[in-house]
Amino acid sequence: MMKKLIYQTALIAYVNAICFRNFRPTCTKISEQYNRNIIYDSENSYVSHDRLQRLLVFEGKWNTYIQKHYSCLLKLRESSSKKKTYLIIDDTVIAKPYSKELDSLSWIFSPSDRQYLYGINVVFVIWTDGNTRFPIGFRIWNKHDKKTKIDLAMELLNEAKKTYKTKPSYVLMDSFYPAAKLLKLIRKFRWQWIAKIKSNRCINGTQAQEFFRYRYGNHIGKLSENIKARIVKDNDNYWATSDLSLKPSDVKQYYRNRQIIEEFHKILKSELRLEGCSSRESLAQMNHIYFVLMAFCQLELFRITRNIGTIYKVRAVLFDCVVPKNLNWKLNIMAFA
């Protein structure tokens, strides 16, 4: 019980320091920020550098922790909102240009950065209704592992279905992910999907760039392995969807929601320092990702319950606050007006 309490205090310190400050999250700096304004005879105990280091290499069930404490975001919005909801698949690179000893490091092309980066490739699936965002989970891709990023995305979709019982209007993905086996899994779940596809993807046995002879196009055909889809062309862009009832304009409109996961990645990196863990332990790197996701959920829950526009607006006020000693933040709402 005492050990659990010690790790709980360290976790609160780690998550709150990430939320309330903008620095590289080393154990020393987190300890310094959290321990400020603590009185010796108060109920709050000091969190040492060593305790935070032990937390980073502790094999906790962090995914279960996120589900228990933050899935209310998903459930409340999904049950009350009449908006369309989406599951979005994407991956990002956690740049580690100076690391050498981590097993999962490799050179990966980052489309958002338009260059090859040396780092950790992470596959995310998030749920959103266009406003609220909730991370279903993540998987780290290892080039030495037999699992592909498609396989990892399928694991996360299984988690969304079985653990969170989600019923998305559409699953959104870029042109890397609509492999036949992933699309079949979505069909098995009785979900619909919308994806960007490459110009060399075959439609009825002919590449899309040759199938459509004009600038714009719209056709119901079959992709590989007899997967029926509506394919839409707009200049050099191609989309496909399993929902044959959609108009071409609707396909493009709904697909724009995929941009939400790009902003999600931006917040994790620029605001919550996803790339900031300097540990050489693979477990510590993975735990840091979990703690950053907890910080994101904490900010998102605060933003939604207080009806604040963006996480950036929340953070601008938090910078001037003392790092709290619990996760039940009691802040002056007028500061966010």
Task: Please give the residue ranges for each predicted region.
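Gly/serine-rich nucleotide phosphate-binding loop at the start of the catalytic core
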Residues: M1-I66
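Single, function-defining residue in the core of a domain
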Residues: M2-Y7, L11-N16, R21-T26, H69, ...
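Active-site-proximal, Lys/Arg-enriched surface segment
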Residues: A17, R54-T132
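Residue-level signal for inorganic ion chemistry
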Residues: I30, V125, M294
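Alpha-helix termini
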Residues: I38-D41, K75-S79, K161-T163
